[in-house]
Amino acid sequence: MADVQMAEAETFAFQAEINQLLSLIINTFYSNKEIFLRELISNASDALDKIRFESLTDKSKLDAQPELFIRLVPDKTNKTLSIIDSGVGMAKADLVNNLGTIARSGTKEFMEALQAGADVSMIGQFGVGFYSAYLVAEKVIVTTKHNDDEQYIWESQAGGSFTVTRDVDGEQLGRGTKITLFLKEDQLEYLEERRIKDLVKKHSEFISYPIYLWTEKTTEKEISDDEDDEPKKEEEGDIEEVDEDKEKEGKKKKKIKEVSHEWQLINKQKPIWLRKPEEITKEEYASFYKSLTNDWEDHLAVKHFSVEGQLEFKAILFVPKRAPFDLFDTRKKMNNIKLYVRRVFIMDNCEELIPEYLGFVKGVVDSDDLPLNISREMLQQNKILKVIRKNLVKKCIEMFNEIAENKDDYNKFYEAFSKNLKLGIHEDSQNRAKLADLLRYYSTKSGDELTSLKDYVTRMKEGQKDIYYITGESKKAVENSPFLERLKKKGYEVLFMVDAIDEYAVGQLKEYDGKKLVSATKEGLKLEDDDEEEKKKREEKKKSFENLCKIIKDILGDKVEKVVVSDRIVDSPCCLVTGEYGWTANMERIMKAQALRDSSMSSYMSSKKTMEINPDNGIMEELRKRAEADKNDKSVKDLVLLLFETALLTSGFSLDDPNTFGARIHRMLKLGLSIDEEEAGDDADMPALEEEAGEESKMEEVD
């Protein structure tokens, strides 16, 4: 084929990342090299989708080749396998850019995944499926013709460069692409008819275009001896003699073998979504899912349904076992639901078809009611599409509930897609209550198991009116939080919301099953006293600590909004709570981590903290006595500042000035170890412990 290239060849270097990828594909041993055929057929199908879509608005686009097909041609003589499609083809610029000089966003991620031990069959998910050809081929030639350009030939042995030549004398395609693989000596199995058929059945049976295989057919023919000694050559192929004589009716008969070639259709299945669900096997769903998504694993769940009535459409939805590497990449358009209109593929990244939070659901929707020539702009206004979307969301939630019936499957699903459900709680007010049923959390009573809100409600203690939760960085960070002390003592269960997105979700999910969701870290936590006597005692305690609260507020100034006696802590000396409508400590941490945050919003939403003190704690009792004896006692001030900074940490906030806090702790240690401050040589560098007073204060030991 290369001999007919009369035009001058241009040589291009592969982009560095693509070169690395090719090197990795060629020099590493992979057991499942067979996936190359799936990838190349999938690319051919995409090219056919594009030209079919273009032809909806301009019929002349199909003039050069009206038939849409994929053809496979094994050539045992030349050891080549060709994949031919009558798709959109590539112009010269596309050829240079798409096959070598511009790396896709997934190139680097795929290499990293491969080096981390991922399966090579993932290649299609990263948009670099073409290069899988080099798993079996030592050289690849791509001949392509686009309607708006001449025919070109791309050729490479993957040695760091490729050539592109204008095809002057080669066989003209009309329109489309022909990929010729020059197979390695140890990969000649892919020229066998049986092997190719098996691979198409396994990976590409549900491609919606006919796949034809150029097959060899041998037939035996009986001729009598008195027919021409020299058998005529049939148009179809060669004839070879079989040395076998047979007497029949007194005449000598001969058998000859006749070899002919023909195109054989090898994907005869009609679109799977048009068949009845009860007729389809589990294996067929798995095969369709893999051909649809390029996933190498089976799906986790499937929902196959049709909607009839005023509006009719059929759909198959799948939930994968894993989240893709770029699930929340905003630059990537989600293209997981393919939209067909009367069996004609229209588009695969229709944002109006499914909400963003369900972007991980893959599948096919085929409608009879949408117009064939629908444009993106029309889709946004289309009422039919809004009804389809509503139905898809409903069916997705049904499918998730079906997964939830199997605990192990649901754990897999929740680990991969819990963020999506929580994003749904935040965005989809209509389905918020249904999505809330799907949430799972660890809690003070669930141990290592996740619990649902429904199960939490069934375990609520008598007299408990609200659902309690705490947000934080991790389960470990919240399970021993001072905020939980009284709740635990009263036997109330508290949910641990330790995912950053929980803060956003719970902000929208105000209640569940008629019960309010109440944060353990915010103001307004009302816990009823067990009896009147206890209530009376608490009131007396509060009264006796009123003066200390005032002194602490004077010392801390505008660091806190107010200081009150706590109802929520039992053992800790104090804690810091936030306003009912402001950010929690955890939300403040999340917002500080946002590089592009609006700082004016931060100052508005990070509400003033309220310091709550525990009247039953020994430290607080001693502090009260000292403050009452001498409210100007400098050790009281130092202790209050130290308690405040410690409470910041235990309540989940960060310190504005960790150095001062460190110095305060060191001072405390010296007192405990009876080290005289005058003797410590490095003390000169220590910051003053009180910001307001310039003079140094010496701490007294607290019993």
Swiss-Prot record:
Its main location: cytoplasm. SUPFAM superfamilies: ATPase domain of HSP90 chaperone/DNA topoisomerase II/histidine kinase, HSP90 C-terminal domain, Ribosomal protein S5 domain 2-like. One of its GO terms (cellular component) is cytoplasm. It comes from the Eukaryota. It is found in: Cytoplasm. ATP binds at N43, D85, F130, R376. One of its GO terms (molecular function) is unfolded protein binding. InterPro entries: HATPase_C_sf, Heat_shock_protein_90_CS, HSP90_C, Hsp90_fam, Hsp90_N, Ribosomal_Su5_D2-typ_SF. Residues 677-694 have a biased composition (Acidic residues). CDD domains: HATPase_Hsp90-like. A motif (TPR repeat-binding) lies at residues 699-703. Residues 220-253, 677-703 are annotated as: Disordered. Keywords: ATP-binding, Chaperone, Cytoplasm, Nucleotide-binding, Stress response. Homodimer. PANTHER family: HEAT SHOCK PROTEIN 90 FAMILY MEMBER. Belongs to the heat shock protein 90 family. This is Heat shock protein 83. It comes from Ipomoea nil (Japanese morning glory).
